């Protein structure tokens, strides 16, 4: 979902030369759909400079707070936000999947699988919130969390057998051959 302050909407519509747009994004979006979006935008507006900041959707330094505080002009996030100072557009939908290393096998017992340590982005990550809700729904108490702000670090630790992770399916296509994906 794309969220933008009212001032930034006007600036993007005007496409002022020499303008700089500060984009906040989830790292999972940064590696999946953002490159294509930015390529199309840059082709149409080559004089506009783009800066990218990664972060979680929610929390004290989350992307929603950054847009409201005007430190980000717009943000690509997951989840829904209702706020009178934010305009939003749904730009796509994705499935959330659980990833684990290849040693897990073909058949999955989710109660057993979710007893593993979760590898996740810091608090405020929508996938982590959904993972915790799912674990609670099936009666599993979440174990220890290994947090990282790097998607590559999380995936590398999943491959090494340190635990499981929960991500949008679109962000893992590059890694798909390295471990099973369950949806």
Q: Predicted segments — roles?
A:
Residues 1-14:
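Alpha-helical "hinge/linker" immediately C-terminal to small N-terminal DNA-binding modules
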Residues 18-83:
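Central regulatory/effector-binding core of bacterial HTH transcription factors
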Residues 22-25, 75, 99, 119, ...:
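Short, well-ordered beta-strand segments
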Residues 64-68, 113, 156-162:
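Hydrophobic residues within well-ordered alpha-helices
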Residues 72-78, 147-149, 166-168, 172:
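Short beta-strand and adjacent tight-turn residues that come in two discontinuous sequence segments
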Residues 83-94, 153-183:
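Beta-alpha-beta core module
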Residues 83-123:
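Flexible hinge/capping segments at coil-to-helix
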Residues 117-138:
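Secondary-structure junction motif
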């Amino acid at each position: 979902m794309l969220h933008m302050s009212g001032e930034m909407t006007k600036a993007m519509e005007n496409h002022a030369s020499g303008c700089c747009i500060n984009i906040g994004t989830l790292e999972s979006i940064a590696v999946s759909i953002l490159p294509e979006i930015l390529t199309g935008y840059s082709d149409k507006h080559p004089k506009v400079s783009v800066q990218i900041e990664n972060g979680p959707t929610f929390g004290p330094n989350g992307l929603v707070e950054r847009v409201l505080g005007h430190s980000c002009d717009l943000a690509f996030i997951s989840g829904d936000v209702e706020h009178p100072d934010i305009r939003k557009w749904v730009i796509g939908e994705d499935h959330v999947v659980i990833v684990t290393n290849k040693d897990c096998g073909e058949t999955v017992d989710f109660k057993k699988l979710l007893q593993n340590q979760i590898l996740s982005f810091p608090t405020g990550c929508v996938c982590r919130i959904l993972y915790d809700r799912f674990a609670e729904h099936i009666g599993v108490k979440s174990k220890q969390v290994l947090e990282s702000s790097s998607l590559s670090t999380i995936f590398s630790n999943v491959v090494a057998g340190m635990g499981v992770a929960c991500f949008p399916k679109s962000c893992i296509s590059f890694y798909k051959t390295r471990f099973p994906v369950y949806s």
